[in-house]
């Protein structure tokens, strides 16, 4: 038999409702940024029970951080599952205030070769990432070169 904890369902619904309302308010007020990233090399994925953490090279000195939840509401999860995050161009809208990422698209040709996907225990992943990257939020740019971020995390794990 399959049982549902009603309290957990209510809490999840409340959280998603609050986030949705914050995102709608930010959209109505016009507070958001359109982002675009042209990938030249494969992003790195750290897969965990609740989703996937993604690092991508943004520039020579910056790394893009995504924390993609395994949720139906986040289009990035389906793109990841279908292998479409290996496309050359990413575009998204990040709303101010709520920090919610919406309207994410991955376009263009696929990057050549294979990317790197690691499966990590969530506590292990978060401890290492927060230590190395300074507690980034979803969609943040980190002041660290991509290769340095990857190698440092891998060394810590």
Model-derived features: positions:
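Structured extramembrane domains adjacent to transmembrane segments
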Residues: 31-148
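N-terminal topogenic membrane-targeting module
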Residues: 1-54
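Short, surface-exposed polybasic-aromatic patches that bind anionic ligands, especially phosphate groups
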Residues: 155
